[in-house]
């Protein structure tokens, strides 16, 4: 799947149509991030919350239609993003509701307002995380990496509230986890704090690796560990999502540590 999220303040679809495969998320890393850098010491949590009930609507051949629907939903102060599924259709997911009833209620209100047409509810049991127990944790880790790898080649572009943009580093991590049912926080600092510290020798695929790229000992960049010496990340403006080496001169001198959420 390729996910695209558009700010409610975006004024033009032209840039969207030129950016199929891009995702808009408020910046959590990047040269102009509005999110404050977080201290090195994490507040360790044991596990991430699971994704709950989500509304899925739309099945469009053209991305512009999914963009318009996403913009309408964001204008209603709803969390929303759209994506292309394996069939090649663009679809939209809305919210993260505590119960099926609340998801249906919201969907019916949107339907009555003619914002959406048909819909269905994505339940907690539909995600990969719900289908994996401790014995199958490795499969979930592989699925997180496989999800992230679908975005290789998608442009990085720092996101803002009134622009149409690509992934930033923490946005890539968040989407890879949330698509698999794990509610990873949005910013790199929050992600650092939410995980369990992992020494380099214990890294497993799907763990997140963190870096200080601004000359401080504060988190400013994150990637998804893919095995061996490599990780997947959204590097900087003007570049595409790609793999990189942990032992490269640049990253090994800026490495802060790793976090696991499983």
Please give the residue ranges for each predicted region:
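Acidic/polar low-complexity segments and flexible, solvent-exposed patches
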Residues: 2-8, 13-157, 162-205, 209, ...
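Flexible loop/N-cap segments at domain edges
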Residues: 223
